[in-house]
Every structure is written in structure tokens, then in C-alpha cells.
Amino acid sequence: AYLGGSHQLAGMKWYGSNIENKEKGLPRSILMMMLNDKDTGAPIAMMSANLISSYRTGGIPGVGARYLARKDSKVVSIIGPGVMGKTSLAAFMAVCPNLETLKIKGRGSKSIENFKAWAKAEYPQLKEIIVCTDNEEAVRDSDIVSFTTTVLNDVSTFPEIKEEWIKKGA
């Protein structure tokens, strides 16, 4: 990809992903970025792209919330309390300053508790953090709902919600 403007660089991001990495103490996705001189192709930088990719991915739902969420949104639900959940919540908090309740739904108690502690420290303006036991509890009465989950290749593991759970205007 060519970056014009003041950057005048070419670059690419390499994405490697394996759901079994977690068992090895590694992140599911391992990303690298290479930047090159636009004229010569000479490498200028090779670096980890995990952080920049996480914020780019989390920023996308933030852009959606900026333009589509109700301005008086108070309740946000994150289903999937991992890295993408964190960057998505960061984006939501930036564009929806009235958020005061966070609902969390996850598969493992460790990731839920880590996310809860992080959210409390990072966003003291949150008045309430609720850990939900199922998707219905997480979705009902939420103004913003974000699924940041990893699923296996089996469609039966895909998260599911019902229309009647969705708050009017959410």
C-alpha cells in the first residue's frame, strides 16, 4: 500500500493467526508491518503491528457509534472481553461521552475479571460494570452492543442474538 501525503512511504502488513496460539501463551494473531521507501523499495522499518492493528480494528465500531449511536447512549455491552473488546470500548468511550454502564459477556472468568479491572482503572466515569451470564442479558437494555469474539470454524459456535433483545434505537 502506498502512503502519500507527508509520509511518502509504501508498506504492507502481514497477518498470521492461529487459534491454538493461546495454548502456547501467544496471542491468536501475530502481525508484522514493513515500511519501504516509495521510490527505491528499500526497507525503512519492520515492526510488530499487533498494537496498531488492534486500535484500527477497535476504531471501526467507534466510527459506527459516532455516526449511528444515539447521542444519549448510556449502556454499552462488550461481548468478547479481549484485546478487540478493549480497543472497541476505548473508541466507544471517546465518541459517546455519556456512557456510564458497561456490560461484559465472555467465556472465561479470567478474561472477564481482567477486562473488568482494566475498564475500572481506565474509565473511572463508568458508574456500573455488570458481568452478564448470557448474550440475552448482555444485549437487553444496551444502547451499543459490540461482538468482539473469536469463533471456531463451526457455525454452531457463532454468537447469536434475537431481534426482540435489541433495545429500540440501539
Positions of predicted regions on the chain:
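Short helix-loop-beta connector
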Residues: L68-V75, N98-L99, K167-K168
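N-terminal ligand-binding/catalytic initiation module
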Residues: A1-R56, I60-G62, D72
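NAD(P)-binding Rossmann-fold cofactor-contacting core
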Residues: V95-Y123
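Glycine-rich Rossmann-fold phosphate-binding loop(s) that bind the pyrophosphate
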Residues: G80-G82
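N-terminal Rossmann-fold NAD(P) dinucleotide-binding loop
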Residues: G85-K86
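Rossmann-fold NAD(P) dinucleotide-binding segment
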Residues: R140-D141, L152-A170
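Short acidic-hydrophobic, aromatic-tinged amphipathic segments that line or gate anion-handling sites
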Residues: K127-E137
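Short, well-ordered coil/turn residues at beta-beta hairpins
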Residues: S146-T149
